[in-house]
Amino acid sequence: MRRIKPFLGALLLGVCMFLTACSGQKEGGETKQKTASSAESSQGEEKKETSAVIPIMYSNLVDEETRNRVSAALKNAGLKDEKITDFFLAVDEYNNAVGKENLVQKTTMTDGPFPSMDSDRLIDLWLQNGGFVGRNCRITSFSLMGDFIAVKNPAAGDTTMLFSDFEAIGKKHLFQGEERKKFDTLFSYIDVTNTHDTKELAKEIIASWKKKGISFHNDKMHMLSVFMTMDDGKNQVQEFIGHTGILLEDGDHYLFVEKLAFELPYQVEEFRSRQEVNDYLMACYDKDADGLTAKPVIFEDDQVMKEYRVLE
């Protein structure tokens, strides 16, 4: 089996376990200023500027207020009632398994740029329940966004590393027939040039999706995908969606809905701007301090996020 670069860990789910590792981002009780480089829309061309990663508001969807906000935003985006119901059933399945008392009880502001949780305890509780097959970020995003994604030329490509996704899909009887083909095509790994040039990588991702006829059709709900690099030094270099979530409009704010990993919670963050969303994701997932691979590239639907920039 092919091996992901060390900063991603042994399995894909390790990508999402950033919470403990990122707890050292604060200094002296204040959030550090970080230099950032922005990329032009759909190009990945960087330009220098400065930004601060700020504290965020987040919830594990235990409280009714946040659940109602998310439900209303999903409904406003045109999601079917049965899909909204299914989403909250999945949320409750996880929350009940690990115990709601072990999650934040209401919308909470972080002390720094990242939510804090006892991830080891949550994993232990998850395992005590048999490590039940739940949902990860990709399954969650597709469950919410799938009706608004078109794939004209399904071609699964390399899905070797999606074995955990496929196990969950099979046991939960999710995504049958054409829907399953769509999932496999969307999340399959993409062969790319061996380069650290995010502009070039973005072009190759866009070209691959265009060839497959992948398009998104919702102006109130968007899938944000964090593309990462698979390079074991022996096989073809590939880009893959290491994390994904759903961005929703909520008045003049934004809600980002994500499932951190099979064994970690559902989480909803509130942001004042799309730039804050990008900076949060880059702070979470740009963990290759040694520069062994290219920087992550964040897509909004089928194009590079306009607010994409790298935090240094």
Report residues per predicted region.
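C-terminal motif of bacterial Sec signal peptides marking the signal peptidase cleavage site
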Residues: 18-21
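Compositional signal for N-terminal targeting/processing segments
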Residues: 48-79, 255
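Acidic/His-rich structured neighborhood in mature extracellular/periplasmic domains
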Residues: 69, 73-230, 238-242, 249-264
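A short, polar/proline- and glycine-enriched secondary-structure boundary/capping micro-motif
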Residues: 264-274
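N-terminal, intrinsically disordered, polar/charged segments of Gram-positive cell-envelope systems
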Residues: 26-61
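Low-complexity, Gly/Ser/Thr/Pro-rich intrinsically disordered linker/tail segments
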Residues: 255-259, 272-312
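Bacterial N-terminal signal peptides that target proteins for export
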Residues: 1-11
